[in-house]
A protein has these predicted regions:
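Glycine/serine-rich phosphate-binding loop and adjoining beta1-alpha1 elements at the start
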Residues: 2, 8, 77-169, 298-300
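Adenosine-phosphate binding glycine-rich loop
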Residues: 118-159, 269, 274-370
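Rossmann-like adenosine-cofactor binding region
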Residues: 209-291
């Protein structure tokens, strides 16, 4: 198969869809890999490394899309890429269709096979291609929350760890999944007082047993969240419904419960956000204020640490990329139900029910068509 790795063009997105070592694995299996010129530079990989791995370097993004049967990316195609995606082409990347109607319509119109990293789901409901970036995003969420808690950045002027005789900051983590756990661990390691919420009692029991002593668990309800907000300094939103829009756990009226300078970090923004007042921001302009509350809502948080993120992502995606290249997407999906669950679009049809429901479009089950 001909596999293409274009350069990401989303704002300050420095990750790349595949490392040179991943390319080498595909070449070893007889596939052809096209990498766009300088695609890996932001992650610390030069063209020469890809060439040594066996890739062919192409000068422009148009060339990569034209030559490739399958595109392997990091982030969803953005508007300049829409015309480049063609019927029958496999695009394997993070899509987050549930919060991008224009993208949804464009990919349906293209007739491409869109396989979303974030909805590849095992029988145990784990999301193997979301986990590595969730681990990065959770760690970064706490770091960014601490940074914007500084007075010069609009925050309260508190140190996360405090000092002897001075109370540490209080951090509220909404959602006890991979992002939330990572965020809570980093916050705890920094010395903050941490509360993590979830609706799953077994998950809360697990977190209570495994977390450091300065992390407390709390059942997630509107009442409990409202009770926590007046004394919280940093709120990290990390709730996820696979493939669907994130629930709004903090509404605009709840901002009045918080002290001015409280920092909200919405990691769920790529699924629409879990704060009513959230809207997507970028690494070049990451924060804004609403009623004196700092909002950080960058949709590609791991893009700020691209070397780590790219390696972690390739470690997770490579086995699926190999299966798709070796077998073709249809056979690969027949053989692996987790990969089949990742197919969101095909031949102009929406094959993922949650996305179809969000946008009110017809849902076409994939199984009879694979």
């Amino acid at each position: 198969m001909k596999v293409g790795v274009p350069k990401e063009i989303k704002n300050n997105e420095n990750r790349v869809g595949m490392t040179p070592s991943g390319v080498a694995e595909l070449i070893k299996r007889g596939h052809t890999v096209f990498v766009q010129h300088t695609a890996g530079e932001g992650s610390g990989f030069c063209d020469e490394q890809y060439q040594k791995a066996g890739a062919q370097i192409l000068p422009a993004i148009e060339d990569v899309y034209r030559e490739a049967d399958m595109i392997v990316k990091v982030k969803e195609p953005i508007e300049p890429e829409y015309p480049l995606v063609r019927k029958g082409q496999v695009v394997f990347t993070y899509f987050h269709f549930a919060c991008e109607q224009e993208l949804t319509e464009a990919m349906m119109k293209s007739g491409a096979v869109c396989i979303a990293y974030e909805t590849v789901e095992r029988d145990d409901r784990t999301l193997p291609l979301l986990i590595p970036m969730s681990e990065v995003a959770g760690r970064m969420a706490t770091q960014n929350g601490a940074y914007y808690l500084q007075k010069t950045k609009g925050g309260k002027g508190k140190l996360m760890a405090g000092v002897p005789g001075v109370r540490p900051a209080r951090v509220l983590v909404l959602g006890g999944g991979t992002v939330g756990e990572a965020a809570a661990r980093i916050a705890a390691g920094m010395g903050a007082e941490v509360t993590i919420t979830d609706v799953s009692l077994p998950r809360l029991k697990q977190l209570a047993a495994e977390m450091p002593a300065n992390v407390h668990t709390l059942y997630s309800s509107e009442h409990n969240i409202r009770q926590e907000l007046p004394t919280t300094d940093v709120v990290i939103g990390s709730v996820l419904i696979p493939g669907d829009a994130a629930p709004k756990l903090i509404t605009k009226d709840m901002l009045s419960l918080m002290e001015k300078g409280t920092v909200l970090v919405d990691v769920a923004i790529d699924q629409g956000g879990c704060f009513e007042t959230s809207h997507p921001t970028t690494h070049s302009d990451p924060v804004y204020m609403v009623d004196g509350i700092v909002h950080y809502a960058v949709a590609n948080i791991p893009g700020a640490v691209p070397h780590t993120s790219t390696i972690a992502l390739t470690n997770a995606t490579l086995r699926y990329v190999i299966a798709l290249a070796d077998k073709g997407w249809q056979q690969a999906c027949r053989d692996d139900i987790s990969l089949r669950r990742g197919v969101n679009m095909m031949d102009g049809k929406c094959t993922y029910e949650a996305v179809a429901k969000v946008w009110g479009i017809p849902y076409t089950p994939l199984e009879p068509r694979v």
